[in-house]
Design a protein with these regions (language model features):
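Conserved catalytic core of nucleotide polymerization and phosphodiester-bond processing enzymes
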Residues: 1-167
C-alpha cells in the first residue's frame, strides 16, 4: 500500500516511511499542522491528504460505513460485526479489522500450502513460523512473498529472525 502511495500519489517525492505516515494520517485523521512538521519542504499536508483520500475513495467508503452504522449493520470486509459508536472511528476500525482478518486468512492459507511451516506467533500483521531449511532458504531467497486474498495479491516481506539450522 505505502509503496503504491509513493509512486501513484506522491510521485516518488518521499520514501516509503513518509508515505506510510501520510497515508495513515489521511485515513485516521492526524491534524495537518502536526503532519506538516514531518513532511519534506515543498509538500503540503492538506493537499497530500486530499490526494490520498481521493485515490483511496475515502469519502465513498465513509458514506457506505455511515449508512451501515445507521442500519445497525456495520461489518468489516469479511462480515464480522463492528461495534463502533463514533463516526470519526468508522474508517479506521473498518480498515484495521478487515486487514487483521484478511491477514489471518492469508496466513492460514500459507500454512496449509506449506505443511513444513509451523506457525509460532502472529503479531499484528506478522506471521512467525518454524520451518525446514529448504523452505527457509526458498523464502529468504525470494525476499518477497505474494499472498492471495479476494482476487488480489499482497506483497509480504520475508526475513529471518534467527538461523537455527546447520548449513
Amino acid at each position: 500500500v505505502y509503496a503504491d502511495m509513493c509512486s501513484s500519489v506522491l510521485s516518488n517525492a518521499v520514501d516509503r516511511g513518509v508515505a506510510k505516515l501520510v497515508t495513515l494520517s489521511a485515513l485516521y485523521g492526524q491534524s495537518t499542522r502536526n503532519l506538516e512538521k514531518q513532511l519534506p519542504a515543498g509538500i503540503g499536508a492538506a493537499g497530500v491528504i486530499r490526494s490520498i483520500r481521493r485515490y483511496l475513495s475515502y469519502r465513498s467508503l465513509l458514506e457506505k460505513l455511515q449508512e451501515k452504522m445507521q442500519e445497525a449493520n456495520l461489518r468489516n470486509y469479511l462480515g464480522r460485526p463492528l461495534p463502533v459508536d463514533k463516526q470519526r472511528l468508522l474508517v479506521s476500525h473498518y480498515l484495521q479489522s478487515s486487514v487483521a482478518e484478511a491477514s489471518m486468512v492469508m496466513f492460514s492459507d500459507f500454512c496449509l500450502n506449506e505443511p513444513t511451516a509451523v506457525p509460532l506467533f502472529v503479531i499484528h500483521d506478522a506471521l512467525i513460523v518454524d520451518c525446514e531449511k529448504e523452505l527457509a532458504d526458498r523464502l529468504l531467497n525470494e525476499k518477497i512473498l505474494f499472498l492471495d486474498f479476494d482476487n488480489a495479491k499482497f506483497p509480504v516481506k520475508v526475513s529471518a529472525l534467527r538461523n537455527n539450522y546447520n548449513s
